[in-house]
A protein has these predicted regions:
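Function-determining surface determinants
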Residues: 1-274
Length: 274
């Protein structure tokens, strides 16, 4: 898998701009973009096997903290939208209380994200510049081409040996699929069908997991007797999303990862990505 310079360096540029301009109450699209480029940068560092470099490890530690903080903001945006899909924008008593609770959590999480970015902004700038120079050096020396195949191959082998998919391991399966997809996207010549198939599973399983998290919060906020109808609708929707997610994940696995020899699966996928 040959890495493309533009795809490799883009997350570094985008993150520098976003971290310098992040407002105290970022819009959902700003949060989404921040999370996406932290993920892509993590994938770049992994694909180029840069974790052994101290400067890259320091940057990974920083972006992981930002990604997690941004994820907590993103979760509230999505969960509020999920509640509104059940009761509509007019709402109902229990739904209004739940949305208000989620909105308060969103404000709290956004403030936490902003404080983190503001506190670490100078360190981020330094580490991003260092890593940018390191990546350009590796690309110039051709190291990325030689070492870029190893991390995707590891993920492919893991996915090829994955146990039977169920509710207990589906979320972790999604994480591995997402990591592989980001790595393959570093190559502009990657097969669009493969990238789309990985993206479909990422989104479908992620949607189910959001409903799981919503049910956990709803059970803490709502009364099981007086608010039982809303709790039931959330639970049933989550169950429906689980079946859809499992079906999509199984299709992906059977099409791309269900080969007798995991090495053959790896060769097949890497050929599609080159």
């Amino acid at each position: 898998m040959k890495l493309q310079p533009d795809q490799v360096e883009k997350p570094l540029r985008k993150l520098r701009m976003q971290l310098n301009a992040l407002p105290p109450n970022p819009r959902p699209e700003e949060v989404h973009s921040l999370r996406m480029y932290t993920r892509r940068l993590e994938a770049t560092i992994a694909a180029m096997a840069l974790e052994r470099e101290k400067k890259a490890r320091c940057l990974l530690k920083l972006i992981k903290s930002v990604r997690k903080a941004a994820g907590e903001v993103r979760d509230m945006d999505v969960l509020i939208g999920n509640v509104l899909t059940i009761c509509g924008h007019q709402g109902c008593g229990p739904a209004v209380r739940l949305v208000e609770h989620l909105a308060k959590m969103r404000v709290r999480n956004a403030r936490r994200l902003h404080r983190l970015v503001r506190r670490e902004r100078r360190e981020f700038s330094t580490r991003l510049k260092q890593s940018s120079r390191l990546i350009r050096k590796k690309m110039k020396n051709g190291v990325a081409d030689r070492e870029g195949e190893t991390p995707p191959q590891i993920l492919i082998t893991e996915l090829s040996h994955w146990p039977s998919l169920d509710e207990g391991n589906l979320h972790l399966f999604r994480i591995r699929v997402k990591e592989l997809r980001y790595m393959l996207q570093l190559n502009e010549q990657a097969d669009a069908r493969l990238v789309d198939a990985l993206g479909e599973v990422k989104d479908t399983v992620g949607e189910w997991h959001d409903w799981v998290e919503l049910e956990k919060i709803a059970r803490k906020v709502l009364d099981p007797r007086s608010d039982g109808d809303l709790l039931k609708r959330i639970r049933l929707t989550g169950g429906e999303k689980l079946q859809i997610a499992l079906a999509a994940a199984i299709r992906l696995r059977e099409r791309y990862f269900h080969l007798p020899d995991a090495r053959k699966a790896g060769v097949k996928i890497l050929q599609m990505a080159s």
